[in-house]
Swiss-Prot record:
UniProt-listed InterPro entries: Class-I_Pyr_Nuc-Dis_Oxidored (IPR050151), FAD/NAD-bd_sf (IPR036188), FAD/NAD-binding_dom (IPR023753), FAD/NAD-linked_Rdtase_dimer_sf (IPR016156), Lipoamide_DH (IPR006258), Pyr_nuc-diS_OxRdtase (IPR001100), Pyr_nucl-diS_OxRdtase_dimer (IPR004099), Pyr_OxRdtase_I_AS (IPR012999)
Localisation per UniProt entry: Cytoplasm
Swiss-Prot/TrEMBL keywords: Cytoplasm, Disulfide bond, FAD, Flavoprotein, NAD, Oxidoreductase, Redox-active center
Protein name: Dihydrolipoyl dehydrogenase
Protein's organism: Pseudomonas fluorescens
Additional information: The active site is a redox-active disulfide bond.
Named cofactor requirement(s): FAD
Pfam families per UniProt: Pyr_redox_2, Pyr_redox_dim
SUPFAM superfamilies named among the record's database cross-references: FAD/NAD(P)-binding domain, FAD/NAD-linked reductases, dimerisation (C-terminal) domain
Length: 478
């Protein structure tokens, strides 16, 4: 006899597990299916983000930055650190332990909220039935009033650089290096490529980033992207724009990459090569032919603004649907869908999803860029404030970057906040909160910010929009 549930969630990543917990909190009988096998040979909850994405990469970024600080920056503070070394296996083991603790935490939350967990592969059948193929190969069918598909995404592989043991790797493999490569190649100058490239560059690798596009960080504000390129290049990342990889050859524990750029065909040899050219939705063996769920032309599950698919009672969230492939976007979609299933009128504002690149300095933004607004014909006022003028940043010896606030010239409503600098991810969230409630630049300028803090840079940038900044000369006074 099949088991019946109010909600069955396929996938326990940041979208799926959050949706399952919220649905259970709302009194719905909920099940969640996960098949990912972790490093210990057991099913691990948390999806790509927790196991091989957001969390482990941040652990390595933090470890590598501490090493860099000890070697290069302590002396400014009067601290003498001699003979600083890095134990890469220990660094990677620390990362693995963090992942283990967090995946176990999700399992505990499932139990606390009454979510029934199934280990295996979930497949949507007709009439909202879900087939679960367990790790032992046995199958069972769950009956659901509602199904939430949260199957996530996987790294894109490219024919010119097929994965090869531990020489050519994707983002997952790049988290497991046991030694610092002397020469590291990275294909793709997006979020993943820049973050992973930064990790190994700080530890001493000679890093070359090959980006097919001629423009660096095209989704970011042009002023911020220009500053980021300058800073990351100074840190040692050799970022080659307009470099299209055409072939690769693994030989004698190295890989030779062939690419074309403005100077014609080029070749570079690396000890390791990371392929970080994006991700694609996971839909393999996910939908039975008679499930009724349709895919769009790019292979994503088609959904409306409330994540409804073409089948009533079937929803899809996260990386498997349109929009930014971000964990926080998936989680909030999960909450929205669970609440709508429970009869609430939940909404999600897709215009205010923050984006972050966790290099150092961090790069973060929310809302629209200046170039987008100008292309749309919107007249704007812009205020900027450099961290070089921030007392708190000076005290921390971390003065690279700036905060940029963009406001509508007619209404003064804030339309975008863009940051490159220390704690950019935290600062941009303050802007997002204000923008969610329709804040104006004047509103932000009238708020009292603690002193001395990095957040004062946001305050000053907001004041600068209308020519009222205190701690820099205003470009124009109003």
């Amino acid at each position: 006899m099949s088991q019946k549930f109010d909600v069955v969630v396929i996938g326990a990543g940041p979208g799926g597990y959050v949706a399952a917990i919220r649905a259970a909190q709302l009194g719905l009988k909920t099940a969640c299916i996960e098949k990912y096998i972790g490093k210990e040979g057991k099913v691990a909850l948390g999806g790509t983000c927790l196991n091989v994405g957001c969390i482990p990469s941040k652990a390595l970024l933090d470890s590598s930055y501490k090493y860099h600080e000890a070697k290069e920056a302590f002396k400014v503070h009067g601290i003498e650190a001699k003979g600083v070394t890095i134990d890469v296996p220990a660094m990677v083991a620390r990362k693995a332990n963090i992942v283990k603790n967090l995946t176990g935490g999700i399992a505990t939350l499932f139990k606390a909220n009454g979510v029934t967990s199934f280990e295996g592969h979930g497949k949507l059948l007709a009439n909202k039935q879900v087939e679960v193929t367990g790790l032992d190969g046995k199958t069972q069918v769950l009956e659901a009033e509602n199904v939430i598909i949260a199957s996530g995404s996987r790294p894109v592989e490219i024919p010119p650089a097929p994965l090869s043991d531990d020489i050519i790797v994707d983002s997952t493999g790049a988290l497991e290096f046991q030694a610092v490569p002397k020469k590291l190649g990275v294909i793709g100058a997006g979020v993943i490529g820049l973050e992973l490239g930064s990790v190994w560059a700080r530890l001493g690798a000679e890093v070359t980033v090959l980006e097919a596009l001629d423009k660096f960080l095209p989704a970011a504000d042009e002023q911020i992207a220009k500053e980021a390129l300058k800073v990351l290049t100074k840190q040692g990342l050799n970022i080659r724009l307009g470099a299209r990889v055409t072939a690769s050859e693994v030989k004698k524990k190295q890989v030779t990459v062939t690419f074309t750029d403005a100077n014609g065909e080029q070749k570079e040899t690396f000890d390791k090569l990371i392929v970080a050219v994006g991700r694609r939705p996971v839909t393999t063996d996910l939908l039975a032919a008679d499930s009724g769920v349709t895919l769009d032309e790019r292979g994503f599950i088609y959904v409306d603004d409330h994540c409804k698919t073409s089948v009533p009672g079937v929803f899809a969230i996260g990386d498997v649907v349109r929009g930014a492939m971000l964990a926080h976007k998936a989680s909030e979609e999960g909450v929205m869908v669970a609440e709508r299933i429970a009869g609430h009128k939940a909404q999600m504002n897709y215009d205010l999803i923050p984006s972050v690149i966790y290099t150092h300095p961090e790069i973060a933004w929310v809302g629209k860029t200046e170039q987008t607004l100008k292309a749309e014909g919107v007249e704007v006022n812009v205020g900027t404030f450099p961290f070089a003028a921030s007392g708190r940043a000076m005290a921390a010896n971390d003065t690279t970057g700036l905060v940029k606030v963009i406001a509508d010239a007619k209404t003064d409503r804030v339309l975008g906040v863009h940051v490159i600098g220390p704690s950019a991810a935290e600062l941009v969230q303050q802007g997002a909160i204000g923008m969610e409630f329709g804040t104006s630049a004047e509103d932000l300028g009238m708020m009292v910010f603690s002193h001395p803090t990095l957040s004062e840079a946001l305050h000053e940038a907001a004041l600068a929009v209308n020519g009222h900044a205190i701690h820099i000369a205003n470009r124009k006074k109003r």
